[in-house]
From Swiss-Prot:
<feature type="binding site">
    <location>
        <position position="185"/>
    </location>
    <ligand>
        <name>Mg(2+)</name>
    </ligand>
</feature>
<comment type="function">
    <text>Catalyzes the transfer of a two-carbon ketol group from a ketose donor to an aldose acceptor, via a covalent intermediate with the cofactor thiamine pyrophosphate.</text>
</comment>
<dbReference type="GO" id="GO:0006098">
    <property type="term" value="P:pentose-phosphate shunt"/>
</dbReference>
<comment type="subunit">
    <text>Homodimer.</text>
</comment>
<dbReference type="InterPro" id="IPR020826">
    <property type="entry name" value="Transketolase_BS"/>
</dbReference>
<dbReference type="GO" id="GO:0005634">
    <property type="term" value="C:nucleus"/>
</dbReference>
<dbReference type="InterPro" id="IPR029061">
    <property type="entry name" value="THDP-binding"/>
</dbReference>
<keyword id="KW-0808">Transferase</keyword>
<feature type="binding site">
    <location>
        <position position="187"/>
    </location>
    <ligand>
        <name>Mg(2+)</name>
    </ligand>
</feature>
<dbReference type="GO" id="GO:0004802">
    <property type="term" value="F:transketolase activity"/>
</dbReference>
<feature type="binding site">
    <location>
        <position position="442"/>
    </location>
    <ligand>
        <name>thiamine diphosphate</name>
    </ligand>
</feature>
<dbReference type="Pfam" id="PF22613">
    <property type="entry name" value="Transketolase_C_1"/>
</dbReference>
<feature type="binding site">
    <location>
        <position position="261"/>
    </location>
    <ligand>
        <name>thiamine diphosphate</name>
    </ligand>
</feature>
<feature type="binding site">
    <location>
        <position position="261"/>
    </location>
    <ligand>
        <name>substrate</name>
    </ligand>
</feature>
<dbReference type="InterPro" id="IPR009014">
    <property type="entry name" value="Transketo_C/PFOR_II"/>
</dbReference>
<dbReference type="InterPro" id="IPR005478">
    <property type="entry name" value="Transketolase_bac-like"/>
</dbReference>
<dbReference type="GO" id="GO:0005829">
    <property type="term" value="C:cytosol"/>
</dbReference>
Length: 677
């Protein structure tokens, strides 16, 4: 190790320690242990701090996000739009150095990590996207895409089940462009890993199909770490796990103990570190000039590499004008012109069809038009109907099951990993529009990943079928009740529950055009009629008046399968002398973004509003005065019988509508949309 290397590693360590000390909050242990690995990995990486969206950059993911003082120190030293002053504001309100990495706030952070295990799954998604992208656009003598994904992960990540799901799939997919580094420091918050984590990780990853490299002294041996990277790159048909034997809190008086994990070092400890490593013990946030020069040199080399890539891409566009134009369009974040003309349009004369089938029809129409759409299912393809006819599977060619240019991903029964991998695909860039299918109830298995989709502003899409008691015989274990309320309550998630074909097309239009908001499409197993008065344009507002009634006594607002039920209830109400209108509200988030004038035209003052949805009523008081829903678990049986059991029939809806009319008769009724703030 050269003296500059040693000085650089010490600088990384001390910047992290100083940042945590300044905040009086954070995690110094992992940065002290992983600094040599970070130094070695970044020296091998191809990136340009001045162009963080260059598509052929290598990606770095910090799965153990609590070690973010390490990442921030690297970003500062390499000249990203992050400075020592930002480090001094570590974990402070409004800073660019939050308590865990956030891709929306931290220049150079590829993904948002913190919940353990998510980052390694994101890394799998990034590597998958890179492989698909390369197989689609690379040509002989034109390696447009040949980047690597590097992931740091800790024992906590390995304990989380989601990492096992994703690592298993990565091994099957033979993602040789993925290199993960396990910080094997044998410490957890509760103490030694001997208390809860004693499995043979290496044997497990070998069984997944990963290549293994071990570095026995990752505290100091950067030559071995660099050699591990070189070895990993030679193994092109397996992802690699590099076991880094490290000491948590290396150099600290508390090194090797759980006490150094998540608390600032004491002042005397910091001083002895600085003295030991040749720094002024009274100075904080020091960056020696020779370290800056060394890192600037690597950046300059990388900028030359990017310039060569730019020239390569220019030549590519001349030799392959159609592909080049398509690729440029994707890099510009634009969709194909008039792609939405492919969306199916329906009339009431068309047959009743389940919205999951309508979803399949949409996918079959738009996938040929939009090459950036890729997707799959968590082993429910025949039920979710997520595979468009003729779509090739994304598989290693050696399996004989597909190839890397394939656009259909077999996720297996791995819902949580699927969600986190989708986040990684979105993080890769190139305008990927990716979707994953499962039953709506099992999107809950992936709640951690879904929440990070929303926080990260990744526009991924869940094709969530079997959306209610309408799935029938599988019973309450599979019938979602609270699921929609949960995800509607999560900020920045568009939860669509379309009622017919036009609304399903509108849902996909919203999802494909989204740039910052994930979507969940809740779709039926049972057939639904095509509605009179629906249209893609109307549904695209998130809510609209389906049945207009002058001087209505009541408005019934519903979603999905209950919209046609509400329409059927009108005849019953008419027989009772009650005039009712019907509003379809397929997506609350989109509706909420409309003008106040428009929203009040749909859900106006002066008329009581009843919501009808065969789910939890939680959250519906924002849009209705009275709520008819299902605040209990469902039942196993034939769907029509279950609907009848819970009185979700035209008569059941009409009964509750009549009671609502009677309750509000003679009273001043203010729209539930109105509020003081």
């Amino acid at each position: 190790m050269s003296s500059v290397d040693q000085k650089a590693i010490s600088t990384i360590r001390l910047l992290a320690v100083d940042a945590v000390a300044a905040a009086n909050s954070g995690h110094p242990g992992a940065p002290l242990g992983l600094a040599p690995a970070a130094h070695a990995v970044f020296k091998k990486m191809r990136f340009n701090p001045k162009d963080t969206k260059w598509i052929n950059r290598d990606r770095f993911v910090l799965s153990n996000g609590h070690a973010c003082a390490l990442l921030y120190s690297m970003l500062v030293l390499y000249g990203y739009d992050l400075t020592v002053e930002d480090l001094k504001k570590f974990r402070q309100l409004g800073s660019k150095t939050p308590g865990h990495p956030e891709n929306t706030d931290v220049p150079g952070a590829e993904v948002t990590t913190g919940p353990l295990g998510q980052g390694i799954c994101n890394g799998v998604g990034i590597a998958l996207a890179q492989a698909q992208f390369a197989a689609t656009y690379n040509k002989p003598d034109f390696p447009i895409s040949d980047s690597y994904t590097y992931v740091f992960l800790g024992d906590g990540c390995l304990m989380e089940g989601v990492s096992s799901e994703a690592s298993s799939l990565a091994g099957h997919l033979q993602l040789g462009n993925l290199i993960a580094f396990w910080d094997d420091n044998k410490i957890s918050i509760d103490g030694s890993t001997e208390v809860a984590f004693t499995e043979d990780v290496i044997a497990r990853y070998k069984s997944y199909g990963w290549h293994i490299v071990e570095v026995s002294d990752a505290d100091t041996d950067i030559t071995a770490i660099a050699a591990a990277i070189d070895e990993a790159k030679k193994v092109t048909n397996k992802p690699t796990l590099v076991r880094l034997t490290t000491t948590i809190g290396f150099g600290s008086l508390a090194q090797g103990t759980h006490g150094v994990h998540g608390a600032p070092l004491k002042a005397d400890d910091i001083k002895q570190l600085k003295t030991k490593w040749g720094f002024n013990p009274e100075e904080s946030f020091a960056v020696p000039a020779e370290v800056t020069a060394s890192y600037n040199e690597h950046v300059a080399e990388n900028q030359k590499i990017q310039q060569q890539w730019n020239e390569l891409f220019a030549a590519y566009k001349q030799k392959y004008p159609e592909l080049g134009a398509e690729l440029q369009r994707r890099l510009d974040g634009k969709l194909p012109e008039n792609w939405d003309k492919a969306l199916p349009v329906y009339t009431p004369a068309d047959a009743a069809v389940a919205t999951r089938k309508l979803s399949e029809i949409v996918l079959s129409k738009i996938i040929p038009e939009v090459p950036e759409i890729i997707g799959g299912s968590a082993d429910l393809t025949p039920s979710n109907l997520t595979k468009a006819k003729g779509t090739v599977d994304f598989q290693p060619a050696a399996t004989g099951l597909g190839d890397y240019s394939g656009r259909y991903i077999r996720y297996g029964v791995r819902e949580h990993a699927m969600g986190a991998i989708m986040n990684g695909i979105a993080a890769f860039g190139a305008n990927y529009k990716n979707y994953g299918g499962t039953f709506l109830n099992f999107v809950s298995y992936a709640a951690g990943a879904v929440r990070l989709s929303a926080l990260s502003e990744f526009p991924i899409t869940w094709v969530a079928t079997h959306d209610s008691i309408g799935l029938g015989e599988d019973g309450p274990t599979h019938q979602p009740i609270e699921t929609l309320a949960h995800f509607r309550a999560t900020p920045n998630i568009s939860v669509w529950r379309p009622a017919d074909g036009n609304e399903t097309s509108a849902a996909y239009k919203s999802a494909i055009e989204s740039t910052h908001t994930p979507h969940i499409l809740a779709l039926t197993r049972q057939n639904l009629p095509q509605l009179e008065g629906s249209s893609i344009e109307k549904a695209s507002k998130g809510g609209y008046t389906l049945v207009q009634q002058d001087k209505a006594d009541i408005i019934i607002v519903a979603t999905g399968s209950e919209v046609s039920l509400a329409v059927d209830a009108l005849k019953v109400l008419e027989g009772q002398g009650i005039k009712a209108g019907v509003v379809s509200l397929p997506d609350q988030l989109t509706f909420d973004k409309q003008s106040e004038e428009y929203k009040l035209s749909v859900l106006p003052d002066g008329v009581p509003i009843l919501s009808v949805e065969v789910m939890s009523t939680f959250g519906w008081s924002k849009y209705s005065h009275q709520q008819f829903g299902l605040n209990r678990f469902g039942a196993s049986g034939k769907a029509p019988e279950i609907f009848k059991l819970f009185e979700f029939t035209p008569e059941g809806v009409a009964e509750r509508a009549a009671k609502t009319v009677a309750f509000y008769k003679g009273k001043d009724v203010v729209s539930p949309l109105r509020s003081a703030f």
